[in-house]
């Protein structure tokens, strides 16, 4: 499904939070949305693999990577796993790598930067907790919508018809 965050803000501005502009688009899908699952991890992506093995229809993985620009939390293998399990998208307060490969996958990916260095694999982090970045607190099961213009958050699904 296509989402237009500008139009959604025109209709629902009093009901949504707008995340501070900081993200770049890396996936093959330019807009996406769904109910969020949160992960908080720093320079370690083993937990992401575990979460992304779950069915992802209608879901977006929101990753609080502490804004790290030193190690990529998302690489081509993790993004492919998300695509295979039908996740709608990934929003990463952190970095990605293998950007040419990410562009070929049918998934939306928003992150703050790219870097060629991969993440650790220790499995350190938390799932389904409240996280805060970009001027917004994200709660598990909130709904998020993203496109090339921006990212918005709503406690309820937005009617886009």
Curated annotation (Swiss-Prot):
GO BP annotations listed: regulation of RNA metabolic process
SUPFAM superfamilies tied to this protein: RraA-like (SSF89562)
Pfam families linked to this entry: RraA-like
GO molecular function: endoribonuclease inhibitor activity; enzyme binding
Record keyword Cytoplasm present: yes
InterPro entries for this protein: RraA (IPR010203), RraA/RraA-like (IPR005493), RraA/RraA-like_sf (IPR036704), RraA_gpbac (IPR014339)
Highest taxon listed in the record's lineage: Bacteria
GO cellular component: cytoplasm
Protein family (similarity comment): Belongs to the RraA family.
Protein name: Regulator of ribonuclease activity A
Gene giving rise to this polypeptide: rraA
């Amino acid at each position: 499904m296509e989402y237009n965050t500008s139009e959604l803000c025109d209709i629902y501005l009093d009901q949504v939070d707008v995340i501070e502009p900081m993200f770049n688009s890396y996936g093959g899908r330019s807009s996406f949305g769904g109910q969020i699952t949160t992960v908080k991890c720093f320079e370690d992506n083993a937990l992401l693999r575990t979460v992304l093995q779950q069915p992802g229809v209608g879901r977006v993985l929101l990753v609080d990577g502490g804004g790290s620009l030193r190690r990529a939390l998302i690489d081509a293998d993790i993004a492919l796993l998300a695509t295979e399990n039908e996740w709608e998208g990934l929003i990463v307060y952190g970095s990605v790598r293998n950007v040419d490969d990410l562009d070929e996958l049918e998934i939306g990916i928003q992150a703050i930067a790219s870097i060629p260095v991969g993440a650790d694999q220790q499995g350190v982090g938390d799932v389904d907790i409240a996280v805060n970045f970009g001027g917004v607190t994200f709660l598990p099961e909130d709904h998020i919508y993203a496109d090339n213009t921006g990212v918005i958050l709503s406690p309820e699904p937005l009617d886009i018809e």
